[in-house]
Amino acid sequence: METTVPLADPNVSESGKGSRLPVFLRGARAVPFLTVVLAGQLTYSAFEAFKGSLIVPLTETLGIRIDQFGILMGWLGIAMFLYVPGGWINNRFTIRSILCSWCAWRLVTGLILFSIPNLSFDVMIVIAASWGVWDAIGWPAVVNGVAFMSQDADKKGRGLAMGLLESIRRGVEFLMNVVVIGALALWSGHTTTVMRGFAIAYTLVLVPLIFALLRRVPKNAVAGDTAGKGESANVEALKGLVAVLIKPRVWLAGLAGLCVYWCYVNLIYSSAPYLSLVFKASDAVAGAFGIFNTGLLGIISGLVAGVLADYLFKSSTRMMGIALLITAIGTLAVRLLPVGDGMMWPAMILLMVMAFGIFMGKAVLLAPVAELNLPEHVNGSAMAVGSFLAYASI
């Protein structure tokens, strides 16, 4: 049976109740907030989270080649084209119901993928395509849930909420992958067994997560709650999506996110090879730098960006502008850096400056959409449209 903790009235500020913590980290909201954040990471923990340092043992476990793994990731990418229709679904159904359904589908299909040996590659493609469809629905529900849990009359905390979403997700992924890498080092002769075991275990983590979502995440307003007399909830959800699509500020916020995410994609795939090819860094140095520059720095930057957005700049939009400025300065400096002996360390420092700016911007990627103060029953579609624009670079 579902039990939820109701939110306080978002039109009344809770910041004056004797606590310096933002509203989503206090009282009845802290656990629901963390539950939504974990839903945004644990759904990916048994497949997409392995695509970096664990891609080779993952493909061996599935019995596929690297190029076939690329095909699966391509099918996952169809989410890009489905974010806008996913906005209608986010208007029509609650955050809780969407996240529970998303996790349940990942649970069932993930167990099929990793439990059945010699699974047909065609079946894998069908599973990957279904994941892409659900990602277009589920991810906007995650960011909408974060915005929903952090809503307060004084608006303070939304930037930090988005920053923590990024930091917690990166931290959880890093720790879960470290555990797998450690196990692979201990049982190096049983790679596929270890990978299969952890993939199944990480998939089964979704079971308690689903129960937590059902029990802890409150119901948000949806289109059916605001439909006029004689008007269906489906029509109201569609009207809400159209209303979001014609708002220039939603498009501008999404395009700003696109600039940040474009830089992010180039950073994670190019920084380590850049050091190796241009400054002749060893594979060990380039690899270690890549892990730090795109892993640990990302965890730190999310928290820093959230704090700066809320408590210094008073706006996630301003924070994103500052992040893009830092990124531009770092990029220009790297471009002007002469190639030669002894320049590898200056290049690494400048790449870290770039990474810091990029991750600060990525941490508040969709926070400007949350700051538009749209009605609760259409905010899900706004996050979907923002996701469509921000992730268009991939």
List the model feature ranges, each with a label.
Residues 51-55, 177, 247-302, 362:
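Extracytoplasmic gate region of multi-pass secondary transporters
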Residues 71-88, 292-305:
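Central cavity-lining transmembrane alpha-helices of secondary-active solute carriers
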Residues 92-103, 310-325:
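Cytoplasmic membrane-interface "Motif A"-like loop-to-helix N-cap segments
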Residues 104-119, 325-341:
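C-terminal ends and interior cores of transmembrane alpha-helices
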Residues 159-184, 387-394:
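Glycine-rich segments within core transmembrane alpha-helices of 12-TM secondary carriers
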Residues 181, 203-227:
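C-terminal membrane-cytosol helix-exit motif in multi-pass small-molecule transporters
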Residues 373-394:
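A late C-terminal transmembrane helix in Major Facilitator Superfamily
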